[in-house]
Amino acid sequence: IKFQANVFCGLANIYAPVYRQIHIHGYKDNNNGLKAFDVAYKDIENAFKYYLNHFNNGNRIVIAAHSQGTNHAEKLFTDFLLENDSILQKVELAYLIGMPVHSLIKDYPACDDPLDRHCFLSWRTFSHGFYPSYKYSDKIAVTNPVNWRRNGAASLYNSHEGILFRNFKIKHPKSLSAVVHQGLLWVTFESFPMQKIFERNDYHIADYNLFWLNIRQNFYERMKVKVEDEKTN
């Protein structure tokens, strides 16, 4: 919540579900792990339905998730949202971050353009040149959260707005470049003070933090276009 959901503070109302999260080792247990995942997901689905009935009040919806939450959010699409078109039409954006999500979610595609809506955004961040031992392929959807494109050249360092630190300060703008490669987001850092604390291969815990202000500003721009479209119509 502190470093991820708060990217939307002041731009949207934020509702976070309380759920019985599966332990990380449950992902390796094909029996009890799957049962625990189903329990966790059902908590998410019930919380979302409660939100719809008590808090939504006809407003548009943005779904934002990370890691295990992304697995549950993807299942929420396939098991609930895609079966309820009137609710699906309210979902302006989905941030499905930190887990592999394939490009083909029926009737809800990956975003291609910095101002697209009614689509999902996804990325998993690694150091440039690193391949994880688990899934990577061109069939996995990835959006570059600096230039908001799904492919093409690496983003410019000048386009990076900074990194959100644990003290809630944004530091080191223009310090990284990102490029999409085989279902991964590869990042390269420019030299800056304390850079060594960022020297790792897997940036899973910082999937939001590394691009926090880029995410916030882009979200504002997408919603600004929505409001302008509504005024025009």
For each predicted feature, which ranges?
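Gly/Ala-rich beta-loop-alpha elbow adjacent to hydrolase catalytic centers
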Residues: 65-73
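Helix-loop module immediately N-terminal to the HCX5R catalytic loop
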Residues: 28-59
